[in-house]
Amino acid sequence: MKPTAFDYIRPTSLPEALAILAEHSDDVAILAGGQSLMPLLNFRMSRPALVLDINDISELQQVRCENDTLYVGSMVRHCRVEQEEIFRSTIPLMSEAMTSVAHIQIKTRGTLGGNLCNAHPASEMPAVITALGASMVCKSEKRGERVLTPEEFFEGALQNGLQSDELLCEIRIPVPSQYVGWAFEEVARRHGDFAQCGAAVLIGAEDRKIDYARIALCSIGETPIRFHALEQWLIGRPVGNDLPADVKLHCREILDVAEDSTMTAENRAKLASAVTSRAIARAADRIVHLDVKRG
């Protein structure tokens, strides 16, 4: 298959791109890495009048860390998140999770912003971003800048909170304390496939009792699920050998998941409980090692 005919514009600055979006917002497709858009065009599932290619906008490719916040341009490629030291040293959870995302060919072209805008329920990065408490910075010529939380940005399966004339420009990610343990775990049919279930975990402890927890799951619902109930249950719990088994049992009791064509609700709850307990065990192990270094 080949795409239907469309106009093509490749701006070199953000103001230029926003002006084009303002003029053509009713029938435009934004080309970032193209890993989702190009198949849709080729199968004629998407038939835009205009394709706006944002690959030459340098403002969207920058990464910097200031005041305990990592500022990531929406056009930063997956391979940079996985490999560059600024990510590995400040937010290693992202780099670890990125090893499970797709394959090297896709990671070389795919972008963080494009992945988030695609908002696939089984995608890893939306869950990671949710666990980290990141903010999405959206800009338009008319509205200026809007900053959305993950809960505001991810509206449903393949649905995001962008207005038709807006562009996701930056992701702002709070840098966790160096004493916070972290881990990402998932189960997929093959490495690089979409997750059947994934868990992103951040936990901290003082005197070997958990005093901080942020957990988000993917492939459980239409959007990333922030596991507030488990976070609250973890606070005050001791970090020890019994923690993973206790977490697994408690998850089974409180998880509410829907059945779909790929898995029964019971099996998905079992899978999510196992994946979450495994991630918490690894994050807790990192807390122990950090405590040793701190001591």
Swiss-Prot record:
Residues engaged in binding FAD: 32-36, 111-115
Flavoprotein among keywords: yes
Its EC number(s): 1.17.5.2
Reaction equations catalysed: caffeine + a ubiquinone + H2O = 1,3,7-trimethylurate + a ubiquinol; ubiquinone-0 + caffeine + H2O = ubiquinol-0 + 1,3,7-trimethylurate; theobromine + a ubiquinone + H2O = 3,7-dimethylurate + a ubiquinol
Membrane-spanning ranges: none
Field pH dependence: Optimum pH is 7.0.
Thermal behavior of activity: The caffeine dehydrogenase activity increases linearly from 25 to at least 66 degrees Celsius. An incubation of 30 minutes at 70 degrees Celsius drastically reduces the enzyme activity to 11% of the initial value, and 77% of the activity remains after 30 minutes of incubation at 42 degrees Celsius.
Subunit structure: Heterotrimer composed of an alpha (CdhA), a beta (CdhB) and a gamma (CdhC) subunit.
SUPFAM superfamilies on file: CO dehydrogenase flavoprotein C-terminal domain-like, FAD-binding/transporter-associated domain-like
Any one Gene Ontology molecular-function term assigned to this protein's record: FAD binding
The encoding gene: cdhB
InterPro entries attached to this UniProt entry: CO_DH_flav_C, CO_DH_flav_C_dom_sf, Diverse_Substr_Oxidored, FAD-bd_PCMH, FAD-bd_PCMH-like_sf, FAD-bd_PCMH_sub1, FAD-bd_PCMH_sub2, Mopterin_DH_FAD-bd
Keyword Signal in record: no
Gene3D superfamilies: 3.30.465.10, CO dehydrogenase flavoprotein, C-terminal domain, Uridine Diphospho-n-acetylenolpyruvylglucosamine Reductase, domain 2
Function field: Coenzyme Q0 (ubiquinone-0) is the preferred electron acceptor and, to a lesser extent, coenzyme Q2 (ubiquinone-2) can also be used, but oxygen and NAD(P)(+) cannot. Is involved in a caffeine degradation pathway that allows Pseudomonas sp. strain CBB1 to grow on caffeine as the sole carbon and nitrogen source.
The protein, known as: Caffeine dehydrogenase subunit beta
UniProt source species: Pseudomonas sp. (strain CBB1)
One Pfam family hit: CO_deh_flav_C
Record's keyword terms, sorted: FAD, Flavoprotein, Oxidoreductase
Residue stretches making up the FAD-binding PCMH-type domain: 1-178
